Every structure is written in C-alpha cells, then in structure tokens.
Regions:
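Active-site-adjacent "subsite" loops/lids of carbohydrate-active enzymes
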Residues: 1-22, 32
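Solvent-exposed beta-hairpin/edge-strand motifs
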Residues: 244-257
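Aromatic/acidic polysaccharide-binding cleft in carbohydrate-active enzymes
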Residues: 110-178
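Structural recognition of the beta-strand scaffold that forms the well-ordered cores
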Residues: 26-28, 55-58, 113-115, 150-154, ...
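C-terminal beta-strand-rich structural cap/linker in extracellular carbohydrate-active enzymes
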Residues: 261-279
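Active-site-proximal helices and loops of the catalytic beta/alpha 8
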Residues: 14, 20, 30-112, 142, ...
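Asparagine-centered strand-capping/turn motif at beta-strand->loop junctions
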Residues: 231-235
C-alpha cells in the first residue's frame, strides 16, 4: 500500500541499509512498473545521496523510469521484435524504428538492456533455440552491437538448451561447448575494446545501412575513428546484398582476417549469417 507513508519510509530505509552496510553496487528493481513513480523518485534520490555512482535498473520499459532516476531499463520491445523476426512475422525495419524512437523519446545517455534470453523468457517462453532457432547466434550479435547493454543469461555461454525450473533448484550442466563459449567471448571482447559499442552516452552513433534487401539488416556504430559495421541475414535463406556505405579496410571480428569493403559491391550472406567488421 503505497499510500502508507510509514511503509514507504521503511522500504527506503531497507534499501539504504544495503548501500551503507554492504556497499552494494546497485539495485535491479523487480516489476518496477507496478510501483508509483513518485516512490521511485523519492527512493532513488535518497540512494544517490549516499552513493552518487550507484547503478539503478528497472525491470520495466519506458522513458518515465529514466526520468524517475533509473539508469537502465529492459529492452523488451527489441526482444519481442527479435522473436517475431525469427518467426518470419516481422522485418528489420521494426528493429530500426525502435532504436530510432528510443534515441528520440528517452533521456540522453539512457541505458537499455538487450537480451536474447533471461530468467523469465527461458522458463516461461523457452530457450533462445526454441524461440529463435538457427538465428540464436545472429540475434546474439544484434543484442551485443545495437545501442544498449548486453545481457548474457545463465548457461547461454555453453548453449543451455532447456528451460530452467523457475521456483526450484535446477543446476546448469556446464558442458564444454567451446563453439558458443568462444562466440560470446568474442562478442564481449568486441564490446569492451571498441568505444563505438560502449553504453549510453559513452558509446557511438547508430546508423542503418541500406542493403537493397529487406532480410539483410546492416548498421554501423561510430565514435571518432572507431567504427563497427554489422551485417545480419535475418532469414533461413542465403541472400545477396549491396551495401550503401563507404569503402574501407576492416578486420573481420570472427575470422580475424583483414577484409576490404567496396561500396556498391554485391556480397552474399548465408542463412542466418552474421559479419562483424571493425576499423
């Protein structure tokens, strides 16, 4: 009952306890959208007085949570579009529209959590392999390279392919799945090493690249001299694409090889293929 001032004060006191006594880094606030905004405004301001660099995440989506004082919100709309694209029910235009909209309506510097799986999705809606099939890695590349902070959920680094029980102990079997372990290691290192992919106001600009094919989604992230070009085939068939971007010399992140890119030259991207190039 958020009309009860004593209850509000007690909740804020409990949150402050964990900051002052345990020196925690921050909070993930569950189901934040079912709590009044004015409570968050008061509570988060109090926490920031104690620890100015505290990190605050809302399990919710919407610009109002950033206005309330949260640093990061869930990228649910992007996640749902990934699932729809995987089923052939949506095109990359939808993802591009969401990103452009976020850049317009959210406060500058907002963080968005991008993901292909999390504890709710895995248990209730299925693993990324159930929902995204052979596109699981492709959408993993997307989640790690579009604007936002990338979530790696329990077991994804070893290709966990079953739903974990939500309310009972259900341990992950840590298989030696080096294919996926190396895949996510490469993505995490890519994000760490390239300022263009950093989060919030620290990261670079996003720009969609015309490919002359609705199933091939390409974009750049650029900050100063640092540029990352991502090319994704969001379908189960190979397709040709013509990139409307500048010619240049790049390094292929996944092969480690140098690669020249010529503007207007046709390239073939295999089914659910992904190419990540950096300068």
């Amino acid at each position: 009952n958020y009309d009860n001032k004593a209850m509000r004060a007690a909740m804020i006191a409990d949150m402050k306890f964990w900051v002052t006594e345990a020196d925690i880094d921050g909070f993930r606030c569950d189901v934040a959208g079912m709590v009044p905004d004015d409570f968050w405004i008061e509570a988060l301001a109090e926490l920031k007085k104690i620890k100015p660099d505290i990190f605050l995440m809302a399990e919710a989506e919407g610009p109002q949570f950033h206005t309330d004082g949260f640093h990061m919100t869930y990228g649910w709309s992007k996640h749902h579009i990934m699932n729809e694209i995987a089923k052939g029910k949506a095109l990359a235009d939808r993802m591009d529209s969401i990103i452009v909209n976020h850049n317009t309506v959210y406060p500058a510097g907002s963080y968005f959590m991008n993901f292909t799986s999390n504890h709710d999705e895995n248990s209730w809606n299925g693993t990324e392999f159930e929902r995204m099939g052979d596109g699981a890695k492709t959408f993993g590349v997307m989640a790690a390279t579009i604007p936002g902070m990338f979530l790696l959920y329990t077991g994804q680094e070893v290709a966990l392919d079953r739903r974990l029980k939500f309310f009972d102990k259900d341990s992950v079997v840590w298989l030696d799945n080096r294919n996926f372990t190396q895949f996510y290691t490469t993505l995490i290192q890519l994000k760490a090493d390239n300022p263009a992919l950093w989060n919030g106001s620290y990261g670079g600009d996003y720009k969609r690249i015309d490919t002359q094919h609705e199933k091939i989604y390409a974009y750049t992230r650029t900050l100063g001299d640092n540029k990352v070009l991502v090319i994704l085939n969001l379908s189960s068939d190979a397709h040709d694409a013509v990139l409307n971007t500048d010619s240049g010399k790049y390094k292929n992140v996944f092969t480690g090889k140098k690669q020249k890119l010529k503007a207007g030259k046709k390239i073939t991207v295999p089914a659910w293929g992904y190419v990540v190039l950096k300068q």
